[in-house]
Amino acid sequence: MDLYPEENTQSEQSHNSENNMQIFKSENSDGFSSDLMISNDQLKNISKTQLTLEKEKIFKMPNVLSQVMKKAFSRKNEILYCVSTKELSVDIHDATGKVYLPLITKEEINKRLSSLKPEVRRTMSMVHLGAVKILLKAQFRNGIDTPIKIALIDDRINSRKDCLLGAAKGNLAYGKFMFTVYPKFGISLNTQRLNQTLSLIHDFENKNLMNKGDKVMTITYIVGYALTNSHHSIDYQSNATIELEDVFQEIGNVQQSEFCTIQNDECNWAIDIAQNKALLGAKTKSQIGNSLQIGNSASSSNTENELARVSQNIDLLKNKLKEICGE
């Protein structure tokens, strides 16, 4: 079934009706974004658990009536798999944990749905959140001690303890830091605060490194999600809730959802995840903080040990560079 209407598309949209696939691209001075959307018909090799209720086992009915009822209540499972990629530079003034970045928005979803045929579009009712990969990259030289704390929260949830989807702490002394979160739940497209479902909060601790107006780092993120006509359409892979890329394990640690096991003992830190933060780029206003403590209260000795470890790693890196350069 061809899900997309036959009409002229904009230059930023690549349309392949034969493969039921669309690619959206946009790039300007503010950053780059790219989105892929592919229909379920092209992903038949993905196994799914069927949720069925056989009406003929509930009601006694003639064979002919049974066939008519079965046909009348049959339902096609519409699924559109989407991958959204965005990159933006962050002002150091906006990297203080006082604003949030929405990783998926109602406007973005409506843009995807607008490209579908009306008979398919009006059946879509759910968005399933599969995975979020986040990469932070410094816009300054390597070797500067620059701790960074990040939290991904569902800001629709009032409890600050329960809203946490995942949190990570790292250091941009090595230039970049990357981690992945697997939300693995579905929400209605009509939920009131859809834009707050995936809210990224970032706190750059070295606040005196630059002045307001200077771009301190780049945030690149990828969100994998699916648009469907049912809450029962999707099965998720059994990944951990949150994970650090292997290469960054030595310079960071993570906090998973409460029922998960923390795999790193160095997890004594906190980040402000107060509700009603301003949107990234908007004017901020003063508000009462609400810090979520990760692990036990951090002691000064733990902080000193962490800084010493980072300093030692930087020294090792410097020595390696000297060996490579033959100094």
Curated annotation (Swiss-Prot):
The keyword Coiled coil applies. Residues 297-327 form a coiled coil. InterPro entries: Caulimoviridae_Movement, Viral_movement. Keywords: Coiled coil, Host cell junction, Host-virus interaction, Transport, Viral movement protein. The keyword Transport applies. GO terms for biological process: transport of virus in host, cell to cell. Pfam families: MP. GO terms for cellular component: host cell plasmodesma. Homotrimer, through the coiled-coil domain. Interacts with VAP. May interact (via N-terminus) with host prenylated Rab acceptor protein 1D (PRA1D). Belongs to the caulimoviridae movement protein family. Transports viral genome to neighboring plant cells directly through plasmosdesmata, without any budding. The movement protein allows efficient cell to cell propagation, by bypassing the host cell wall barrier. Acts by forming tubules structures that increase the size exclusion limit (SEL) of plasmodesmata, thereby allowing viral ribonucleocapsids to spread directly to neighboring cells. This is Movement protein. It comes from Cauliflower mosaic virus (strain W260) (CaMV).
